[in-house]
Design a protein with these regions (language model features):
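A short acidic, amphipathic alpha-helical/loop segment
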Residues: 158-162, 230-237, 261-262
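Extended hydrophobic-aromatic, low-complexity segments
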Residues: 206-207, 218, 225-230, 257-260, ...
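Short, internal strand/loop/helix patches
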Residues: 260-296
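Short acidic, S/G/P-rich loop/turn micro-motifs used as interaction or catalytic elements
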Residues: 148, 222-226, 254-256, 307
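Non-catalytic, surface beta->alpha helical segment in thiol-disulfide oxidoreductase systems
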Residues: 288-312
């Protein structure tokens, strides 16, 4: 119901949220009259009712670009604590705060596509959140959002410099820095990194040893049947445009036998990642629709999503 109400005024939307929330709260009150629960359990259930709706309110504010004066008391009105350690691992709570910091940042900086916006947001999170457990989660989310966006390495460098000055969380800093360094390594013009693959005979190979043709690398999993079929259909279309390229179909799973059973095309070079965790970090495989174009000398020419190429 609430998702269908995004065209309403903000005031009416809040009334609908309050109405739905009241129904849920009354049901919980009735439940408590019949079943005895601990104070902690009561708190967690109340928050489980509240925060999915708080996240929806923040989404409404974002999508409709609602003026600050209409929602600046929202924390007070709903008795929201941004530093409740009991909710550190409660996803709707963290999602709410993450959206809230976006909307707060947008009050001062309307240029949401600029790297300065994300740096401002980083500082706002640092100022608003005193709980290290919650802050570390939000810092990590923001850093990964920035690094995985299709922005320039120079812009990412500016953000990372600020991030590492502010963040005191060593494990997260190391993780973020590793991602950033790997991104620099796979920018167009650089050599394709060393990644080991297995062929259909089980032999281990390094595709960089093949220097006779340009290459297209794409990825799939036998656990995702719909994607498996869709990606190969798209690759079939792409091959007409890149007929002078050798196509490598890379399975990301561990089982050699299951992989062999699920191969659906012999019109490509079928290989499997030997260590997906290592490969995904080196190649930043955050999306199975990502494809790599390599030159004959195995330099990275382009990294893109296959849908961008099919549509264009």
């Amino acid at each position: 119901i609430l998702n269908k109400s995004f065209n309403e005024s903000f005031g009416n939307y809040l009334k609908e949220v309050d109405s739905v929330l009241l129904v849920q709260e009354n049901k919980f009150i009735e439940f408590k009259s019949k079943v005895k629960i601990s104070p902690f359990a009561e708190k967690m259930i109340n928050n489980a009712l509240l925060y999915p709706y708080m996240e929806k309110i923040q989404s409404f504010i974002l999508r409709r670009n609602i003026n600050e004066e209409l929602w600046d008391k929202i924390l007070y009105d709903y008795k929201i604590d941004l530093n409740d350690k009991d909710l550190t691992f409660f996803k709707p709570y963290i999602d709410f705060i993450y959206l809230y910091t976006f909307n707060i940042t947008r009050i001062k900086n309307k240029e949401i596509d600029k790297i300065d916006f994300q740096i401002n947001r980083l500082n706002i999170i640092n100022e608003l959140i005193s709980s290290n457990e919650i802050k570390s989660k939000l810092f990590r989310f923001l850093a990964f959002e920035v690094l995985l966006k299709n922005t320039s390495i120079s812009e990412k460098s500016i953000f990372i410099d600020e991030f590492l000055k502010i963040s005191t969380f060593k494990s997260i800093n190391d993780e973020v820095d590793e991602l950033y360094e790997n991104q620099k390594k796979i920018t167009p013009g650089n050599d394709f990194p060393l990644v080991y693959f297995a062929n259909q005979n089980g032999s281990i190979l390094d595709i960089r040893g093949e220097k006779k043709s340009k290459k297209v690398l794409f990825f799939w999993s036998y656990d995702q049947n719909s994607h498996l079929n869709a990606i190969h259909q798209k690759i079939f279309k792409l091959k007409t445009t890149y007929s002078n390229h050798k196509f490598y179909s890379i399975n990301i799973n561990d089982s050699q036998s299951k992989w062999l059973d699920n191969i659906i095309s012999n019109d490509v070079v079928n290989i499997r990642s030997v260590n997906f965790d290592e490969m995904s970090k080196k190649l930043i495989i955050d999306n199975l629709n990502k494809i790599f174009f390599l030159s004959e000398e195995n330099k990275i020419q382009k990294i893109d999503l296959i849908d961008n190429l099919i549509l264009n």
